[in-house]
Regions:
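Short, structured segments at the rim of ligand-binding sites
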Residues: 1-206
Length: 206
């Protein structure tokens, strides 16, 4: 199958949807609070530098596009490796060069996420490089993009969630094996639809 266009690690994937909007956007995530016990709460700090304002309420958190994004992002992600895919994809789509360190654990996750990111982003026209099996960087280099890119998920839920909001920039993008999101966020596609995304699901023959 392919898809077209309360866990903080999963919910943070929604923040890149706000970030990539071409206009002011607002998303409310219920049940997430400032003093999270999950390390991924630091992701909100990083998104601030990309122009996403985080406001905590008694219901959860409200995310709003606000401010001027950084022109470059250098970040040690040793404490938030599960968010690396989201930030890598978001920065590329925003044309923000980056250098992310502390990613040594990505080689031994559900898939080799470093290689997967490099491979799939090339389909979108971005030449991302790695160093020392623990660093991902992009200096703005581009390459010819696929006309109708199909993103492989490698049986990795975070690959699907990191690339899905790219449809805001590339409406023709497709996500292969979308059901992988059930590992951490079973309602991900339904929630995207509620947020205003058009999600089309097609059965594909192997």
């Amino acid at each position: 199958e392919k898809i077209k266009g309360g866990d903080r690690s999963s919910a943070i994937e929604r923040e890149d949807s706000t970030k990539e909007e071409a206009h002011t956007a607002e998303i409310e995530l219920l049940g997430l609070f400032a003093h999270s016990y999950q390390g991924d709460s630091r992701g909100a700090e990083v998104f601030t530098r990309l122009g996403v304002h985080t406001e905590y309420t008694d219901r959860g958190v409200k995310l709003t596009r606000k401010g001027t994004p950084a022109t470059r992002l250098d970040e040690d992600m040793v404490d938030i490796p599960d968010l690396a895919q989201t930030f890598v994809v978001t920065c590329c789509l925003m044309d923000i060069p980056f250098r992310f360190t502390g990613l040594q654990s990505l080689k031994i996750k559900e898939t080799d996420r470093i290689t997967a990111l490099i491979t799939e982003l090339r389909k979108l026209g971005y030449v991302v490089r790695s160093e020392q099996d623990s660093i991902l960087l992009w200096d703005g280099e581009r390459c010819p993009a696929d006309a109708d890119p199909v993103i492989a998920t490698y049986e990795d839920h975070r690959m699907a969630m990191a690339f899905a909001p790219a449809c805001l920039v590339l409406p023709q993008i497709q996500i292969d094996e979308p059901q992988v999101v059930t590992k951490s966020y079973p309602a991900y596609w339904e929630d995207l639809q509620k947020a205003g995304f058009k999600v089309c699901q097609n059965a594909m023959q192997s």
